[in-house]
Curated annotation (Swiss-Prot):
EC number: 4.6.1.18
Assembly mode: Monomer. Interacts with and forms tight 1:1 complexes with RNH1. Dimerization of two such complexes may occur. Interaction with RNH1 inhibits this protein.
Gene that this polypeptide is encoded by: RNASE1
Protein role: Endonuclease that catalyzes the cleavage of RNA on the 3' side of pyrimidine nucleotides. Acts on single-stranded and double-stranded RNA.
Family statement drawn from the similarity comment of this UniProt entry: Belongs to the pancreatic ribonuclease family.
Domain of life: Eukaryota
Disulfide feature: C26-C84, C40-C95, C58-C110, C65-C72
Primary localization class, coarse: secreted
Species annotation: Damaliscus korrigum
Location(s), subcellular: Secreted
UniProt cross-references to Gene3D superfamilies, sorted A to Z: Ribonuclease A-like domain
Pfam families in the record: RnaseA
GO molecular function: lyase activity; nucleic acid binding; ribonuclease A activity
Protein name as catalogued: Ribonuclease pancreatic
Length: 124
């Protein structure tokens, strides 16, 4: 079974590019990362930074998660991210996404030993 840390990497990490390469980025990434297999995942964020830099956020600014849990951390610096949001015309299995490039602080939930990101909570 895929670990929570591995799932985070599959769903949110794209260290190989510094930003979204084209407007098709989200359509392609959501499909290739299996985020449209049994439904269209409505929203997803990819982070264009090294895994080490994202894992380091687990020791940065301690903040509350959206659900009120306390295991979330906000990055001290802004990171290059791409937000993928399902469009109005998107219909499974033909999932369609709007690609939005941004530089923002990320908020992740961390757990385990080693203490690593397992959930992408928000960007601010």
């Amino acid at each position: 079974k895929e670990s929570a840390a591995a799932k985070f990497z599959r769903z949110h990490m794209b260290s190989s590019t510094s930003s979204a390469s084209s407007s098709b980025y989200c359509b392609z990434m959501m499909k290739s990362r299996n985020l449209t297999q049994d439904r269209c995942k409505p929203v997803b964020t990819f982070v264009h930074z090294s895994l080490a830099b994202v894992z380091a956020v687990c020791s940065z600014k301690b903040v509350a998660c959206k659900b009120g849990z306390t295991b979330c951390y906000z990055s001290y610096s802004t990171m290059s991210i791409t937000b993928c949001r399902z469009t109005g015309s998107s219909k499974y299995p033909b999932c369609a996404y709007k690609t939005t490039q941004a530089k923002k602080h990320i908020i992740v939930a961390c757990z385990g030993b080693p203490y690593v990101p397992v959930h992408f909570b928000a960007s601010v």
